[in-house]
A protein has these predicted regions:
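Histidine-centered active-site/metal-ligand motif
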Residues: 44, 69, 81, 86, ...
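Metzincin-family zinc-dependent endopeptidase catalytic domain
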Residues: 77, 81-83, 110-112
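A well-ordered secondary-structure block
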Residues: 88-183
Length: 183
């Protein structure tokens, strides 16, 4: 076909056909602060229960701090841990990103919890079956025995969701024996 004919055919096509989403496209994930808090606590505490450590409590302060960093990433497009001096001593941090609106909070946390498949008991950072502690770092922060609080937040750019969880006291400390404490 000639390019001019293709252009004419494209211009003659109904605009609505190009703008309507496919019926096979997934519906946007449910969102909201109450759902975020409920989903996050449920997913974290299920993982902690399986590991044999006490439940986490929600921290509004940690959630507010997480929101600041999530917004920063959404505004700048720079994905990475908060580099604010002293933040690491104050709170642990887990990050996730994905296509805007497609993933539920359960999926966001579930990706982190799924790292359990690579976990092996040991002295941190030697706690990964693969030899790479970063492949279990989200999971180990979630189940870290001395962590008592979590707060998470979500911010979005035009295309990307940025999800941040903060933990206190922070986990993933070198030299700490980390083993499941199932009864």
């Amino acid at each position: 076909m000639k390019p001019a004919f293709l252009l004419a055919l494209l211009l003659a096509s109904p605009v609505t056909a190009a703008t309507l989403p496919s019926p096979n496209w997934p519906a946007p994930a449910d969102r909201g602060e109450a759902l975020l808090q409920k989903s996050v606590l449920n997913a974290h505490n299920q993982a902690r229960d399986r590991f044999g450590v006490p439940e986490l409590n929600w921290s509004g302060q940690l959630a507010a701090e997480a929101m600041l960093h999530a917004r920063y990433m959404a505004q700048t497009g720079i994905y990475g841990h908060d580099q604010t001096p002293g933040r690491r001593k104050k709170a642990g941090e887990n990050l996730w990103r994905g296509q805007r609106g497609l993933f539920s909070y359960d999926v966001m946390v579930g990706v982190m919890v799924d790292e359990a498949r690579h976990f092996r008991p040991g002295v941190f950072p030697n706690v990964s079956r693969t030899g790479d502690w970063s492949q279990v770092a989200h999971y180990t922060q979630i189940v870290w025995p001395t962590t008592t609080e979590v707060g998470c937040a979500l911010a979005s750019s035009a295309t990307t969701d940025y999800f941040v969880c903060r933990y206190a006291p922070s986990g993933n400390k070198d030299g700490y024996q980390l083993a499941e404490r199932r009864d």
